[in-house]
Amino acid sequence: MSDENENGRPGGRTPMTLKPRQGSVSAGVVKQSFSHGRTKTVVVETKRTRTHAPASGNLAAPSSAERRHGEAPAPRPAPPQGGGGGSAGGLSQEELRARQRVVDAAREAQARQVAEQAAAEARARAAQEAAQREAAAKAAAERAAAAPPPVAQAPAAPAPAAPVTPPPAAPQAPRPVAQAPVAPSAPRQDAPRQDTRAAAPGQTRTYEPSRDRRDDRPSTTTYRPAPQGDRPFNQRAPRPDANANFGQRAPRPEGDRPRGPRPDGDRPQGDRGGYRGDRPQGDRPQGDRPQQTVRYSALAPRPAPGARGPGGPPRGPRPGVPAAAPATPEIQRATRSAPRPGGGAMDRRPDEDDDRRKNAAPNKAVSRVKGAPQRREGRLTIQAVAGDGDSADRMRSLASVRRAREREKEKRRGGAVEQARVAREVVIPDVITVQELSNRMAVRGVDIIKFLMRQGVMLKINDVIDNDTAELVATEFGHTVKRVSEADVEEGFIGADDHDEHMDLRPPVVTIMGHVDHGKTSLLDALRSTDVAAGEAGGITQHIGAYQVRLKDGQRVTFLDTPGHAAFSSMRARGANITDIVVLVVAGDDGVMPQTIEAIKHAKAAEVPIIVAVNKMDKPGSDPTRVVNELLQHEIVVESLGGDTQLIEVSAKARTGLDNLLEAILLQAEVLDLKANPDRSADGVVIEAKLDKGRGAVSTVLVNRGTLKRGDIVVAGSQWGKVRALLNERNEQLQEAGPATPVEILGLDGVPSPGDAFAVVENEARARELTEYRIRLKREKSMAPVGAGASMADMMAKLQDKKLKELPLVIKADVQGSAEAIIGSLDKMATDEVRARIILSGAGAISESDVMLAKGAGAPVIGFNVRASAQARALAEREGVEIRYYAIIYDLLDDIKGVLSGMLAPIQRETFLGNAEVLQAFDISKIGKVAGCKVTEGVVRKGAKVRIIRQDIVVLELGTLQTLKRFKDEVNEVPVGQECGMMFAGFQDIKVGDTIECFTVEEIKRQLD
């Protein structure tokens, strides 16, 4: 019976709970441990019994001693439903008095029935005892024949309860009962019972919980009223005097009754049970009682008191215990309405109980109805707490039960309501993993994978997808997309353009360009009144220099001196890109040269105006007209010919024409209207960089806009640092540098590359972010060619590269620009057969780490305008590493070119001598085959190379003519028309008709172009 069915009834059970009961129930906690490692804490409830005095009027259940002596138990008082304050039994005084009146009426009715029943019982007792003994003996004989068990003393058969009479009387001595051996019974088949409610309408059955535990099983046996009618007299217990009253009966001794040896197997059935109507007469069904599995659930209602269990009949009073007195309708109503002291219903209606027990299958355990919710099974009992394995296995935790209830509620509601998706702005970088995308979208990764699978893309949770695919997924899930890139860190590095109202005039930046040895540096020295050219190695400029000249009128002009050698093409290009005006220096006696043409191309590419300075006009033979005509071939039209290019004749040595040159520069700057904003953060370009032993990384920069100050945080390429010092070209300390000012800055953590842009950033975090991104980008670019080459053409190119000879080199230069120029020149020397492979290049002195790196690669160390430290020199001597020093780039490139030329394979050149034809082949013992030949063309020479041709097929290539004889004499040469004998080294397959071609091979050494 479910909790819902009982809630509306007056005597219905209340829902079970694991909470400790109040009042008469004490609770404790017991911790269970299982073999599989789980532990469980259960609540143990112990009901405290309460004893009541007989004279108080509280008609509680009689004690076990009274029940043993055959007294009819009085109806149990029904406590009030409200549970308010009452007597000790839970009833108010008015209810107790009403209850007492009902009980007194019942006693009077029972007294009247005693006299009528006594005579009938006496007559039927003898016959019934005889029939019972005969049936018991027959059943015992049959069971003993099947499986003889040990014989034990049978318990006394129960007798019907004796009627209680009001007058007191002495208790009657118990009558001895015959004993018979009892064997395990067969499965009991319940005989059909008759409903006796029609015959005895005034009789009802009242259930009382048993207080006497006679075995270890949890008993739910209840007291039932004694059925009317005859019962076998031999099953009665010793009964007291019929005239004895409740208070006059002898008290029943406390404790369990003395037991004899318990018979093995199942006890005989049929001797227990409540009132079931008139029992059919005859032999009792034989067989053992069916074994039934009783399963209790903590969520299901408990069996009603008096119910034996699911699928089994209710138990009646124990043998020898009198049944309760028949109750009147008032007692029936009071009993039904009275709840159990511990909560819950105390009894069930007899008709429903009997019908349910009668229709239940005897061998079928209680199971869950198909489709019904699976509830928690297991019952909190002493057996479960004590370690009963079956009960412990059936127990489930309270949290599990709660989760099951939640699932049941969700099923009844039609399933959990799916949470509405919230549209978000998803930031998507260039590449992103599926896991990261799911986190940003707040969706499950498996949902994204399913969507991609429907699109035909099979991915795992850690796979990387591009931003286009990620945008498609995010849009499909209803989110908005914001695409970002790692390159976004570069945004704002160089500030926006300035407004005109913030602009001020700035000095012009002039780059001196031209061919080598045309007097560029000498001209700049004349303008600066210095002598820089005298201190240069080889009389040539190998570094880009930056100077600022202050004129007589206070104006300033910034000059950049670029090298004129072919190796410094990148420097010239860099100078053209950062300059405002290009001064093209052309020697009057030499004219336009290759580097002059290159400078013109750089200036045109940078869209920079050109001023032509014809130098060396003091030398005889200088012809400016020749220079003008040669410039016309390269689209340079001077003003004298109607063009816009100024041409100035100067002499750096005689210092003539310098003022005209400065005037032309200022005029061109005025036309350009050069302006910049000094009141902003500085940015510019790195002109040159080097590594100084005492000062560290030194970078020469040109400020384009803003003002660079000491203490600013500067990012230049992949290097950053705080400006510790600002130096001009005269090594003077500066506090700040304005627009178009070249300065040297100290404080960077490394040497930047020439041509890198620099700018001042707001903090160190921003500087680190920029440099880390640039370093990562550079590393990815350097590693990119490793994974290339998936096509067949690339694979063939790799196979050819394996035949390529390489010259490993470690190059250290004084400045980064010089190292860059050397590497560029070496790359131009490379051919399909040889090339120079740069292991390391940089600016600074040669260190021990450079020597060890060169030793591992088997490479020499090239020092350009630098020297090795003492420790590095000693290490190089011990390890056998060659160090070469150079001060002029010509010498360095010539030596490397010679080494690469020596690595080229020499050319094999053949010189034809003559042909001969084999006329006869002789096989001579101990010598081998000898060819008898006739020279048909030219001469044949001993020791020359031969090629044997047979039917237009070469059968011997590059053989050697080992022996040449004329008759019996060995000769060195046989001319045309004569016969001779020939023998070849390592070749015996000579046949008549073969053609022998004789020639010489000469090796020619190759040179790089």
UniProtKB/Swiss-Prot annotation:
Molecular function (GO) terms listed?
A: GTP binding; GTPase activity; guanosine tetraphosphate binding; translation initiation factor activity
**Residues where GTP binds:** 514-521, 561-565, 615-618
- Stored Gene3D superfamilies: P-loop containing nucleotide triphosphate hydrolases, Translation factors, Translation initiation factor IF- 2, domain 3
Outline the segment boundaries, as ranges, of region: G5.
651-653
Annotated region G4: the residues are 615-618
- List every stretch annotated G2: 539-543
Q: From what superkingdom does this record's organism come?
A: Bacteria
GO cellular component terms given for this protein? cytosol
Q: Where is the composition biased (Low complexity)?
A: 111-121, 137-146, 175-189
Print the keywords alphabetically: Cytoplasm, GTP-binding, Initiation factor, Nucleotide-binding, Protein biosynthesis
Xref: InterPro entries:
EF-G-like_DII, EFTu-like_2, IF2_assoc_dom_bac, IF2_II, IF2_N, P-loop_NTPase, Small_GTP-bd, T_Tr_GTP-bd_dom
Q: According to the UniProt record, where is the region G1? A: 514-521
Positions of the region G3?
A: 561-564
Location of the tr-type G domain: 505-675
Q: Which HAMAP family match?
A: IF_2_B (MF_00100_B)
Described by its record, this protein's role is as follows: One of the essential components for the initiation of protein synthesis. Protects formylmethionyl-tRNA from spontaneous hydrolysis and promotes its binding to the 30S ribosomal subunits. Also involved in the hydrolysis of GTP during the formation of the 70S ribosomal complex.
Q: Which NCBIfam families match?
A: IF-2, small_GTP
Family note: Belongs to the TRAFAC class translation factor GTPase superfamily. Classic translation factor GTPase family. IF-2 subfamily.
Q: What is this protein called?
A: Translation initiation factor IF-2
Which species does the entry assign this protein to? Caulobacter vibrioides (strain ATCC 19089 / CIP 103742 / CB 15)
